């Protein structure tokens, strides 16, 4: 039996639309991510467990884990009879890389079960392909950090899909999921087809400056450059209370904040534990909309997806 855990991730990070993402893990030790188990069997089967299992498609072939198994078998050129279990701990349409968690855990578990026939680059390419079936286009800003850990910059040149960017140990990521769903496809459809030249220049300046600040260890500068002129101005209308929440967390002391992925989760970066706790408390009282919502104080997950049992 192989059991693989794949962590949540926060894509875009305001400054890097479709090209930046970070894996995150709660500081209290909770597992914020999906778990997939693979066992040898006579025929294929898939069982769904976990807090959000009831939100998965009722038709098994529509389940992304089934599609991962099917595509992996196709890649190897043979049917691999296994019993798979998906522990769905991540809310769907949350902006925390929920589909990436399932895809990464499923493909990594299959690869481990079969003795690692695929290298990490090929495996990551498959992960992007499968996750793209749900989001509508192939982009690696969730699957790359989820699989590899840390903060990842998408390269997609010279046979390199992504490379790690140094993060800041001081940063605490407060992630608030309000409990409502925003589909990635809907959030992408709301974006303009063309952008003004001044917005393109600002975006390039912010992203280049942010990467430079990370490598030159300028924490304050990096946080100041986390601005979004590409997606947030258009997507915030999908998120009730988002603008007020951003203003409130800034007043409490967050050094940066924005939409995690395509939303509705809000991320707020803090450089002090007491500030992070006060931000988390405010968001818990004011940004959450129902019982499915949650707030976690996280750090970068530098390990990425990992085998829990083998």
From Swiss-Prot:
It is found in: Cytoplasm. Keywords: Amino-acid biosynthesis, ATP-binding, Cytoplasm, Kinase, Nucleotide-binding, Threonine biosynthesis, Transferase. Pathway: Amino-acid biosynthesis; L-threonine biosynthesis; L-threonine from L-aspartate: step 4/5. Pfam families: GHMP_kinases_C, GHMP_kinases_N. It is an enzyme of class 2 (transferase). Belongs to the GHMP kinase family. Homoserine kinase subfamily. This is Homoserine kinase. It comes from Escherichia coli O6:K15:H31 (strain 536 / UPEC).
